[in-house]
Amino acid sequence: MKRYGIIGGTFDPIHYGHLYIAYEAKKQLNLDNVIFMPAGNPPHKEGKKVTDSLLRYKMVKKAIEDFSGFSISDYEIDKKGFSYTYETLEHFKNNDVELFFITGADCLMDIETWERADTILSLCNLVVFSRGGFSNKNLIKQKEYIEKKYSVNIIVLPLKRLEISSTDIRKRINNKERVDFFVPRSIIKLIEENSLYKEE
């Protein structure tokens, strides 16, 4: 049986933190492939300005091209309407594939507010990594609660903390600050060519 990881996000823009998480997940969980899933129209981003999906797709594709075992899917950006995680998992789930959905600890804290959370937890192994602002105590407490309620096993991915965020990168670009220690040079080139993250 193939072991596929799915890492979703707006990737606006993709940065070294995303690549590090995917690399460590692939290595630690012995995954055959990690699929990057740029979000099309995510419900939790409604009302927020998000870069055109095709440009975000292009940035992700460029960023992962030299990594073996990384791939990209346009499933969510091609979808009409909102992109729900349970639909994405249903699309990729089959008898020959075991799915690992990789997400931040913040998502575990509010997983029950997600559309059809029970379906999500039944379709995949939920893999969470700690991000800034979440104590291990709170994470463990929520992990135990979800595991008991839904009879699932949640995997906590031990990672070195990288304080990189797409929001901070966008602000730095708008302020004409350097971001080449956060973002691959090839992605900076695409950002510059398309004049992204500069306020009108």
UniProtKB/Swiss-Prot annotation:
Pfam family, one: CTP_transf_like
Origin: domain of life: Bacteria
CDD domains linked to this entry: NMNAT
S-S bridge residues: none
Keyword Transferase: yes
Gene3D superfamilies recorded: HUPs
Catalytic activity: nicotinate beta-D-ribonucleotide + ATP + H(+) = deamido-NAD(+) + diphosphate
InterPro entries per record: Cyt_trans-like, NadD/NMNAT, Rossmann-like_a/b/a_fold
Pathway the protein acts in: Cofactor biosynthesis; NAD(+) biosynthesis; deamido-NAD(+) from nicotinate D-ribonucleotide: step 1/1
EC number: 2.7.7.18
Keyword terms: ATP-binding, NAD, Nucleotide-binding, Nucleotidyltransferase, Pyridine nucleotide biosynthesis, Transferase
GO biological process: NAD biosynthetic process
GO MF term set: ATP binding; nicotinate-nucleotide adenylyltransferase activity
Family stated for the protein in its record: Belongs to the NadD family.
Known function: Catalyzes the reversible adenylation of nicotinate mononucleotide (NaMN) to nicotinic acid adenine dinucleotide (NaAD).
NCBIfam families for the chain: cyt_tran_rel, nicotinate (nicotinamide) nucleotide adenylyltransferase, PRK00071.1-3
Protein name: Probable nicotinate-nucleotide adenylyltransferase
Lineage: Bacteria, Bacillati, Bacillota, Clostridia, Eubacteriales
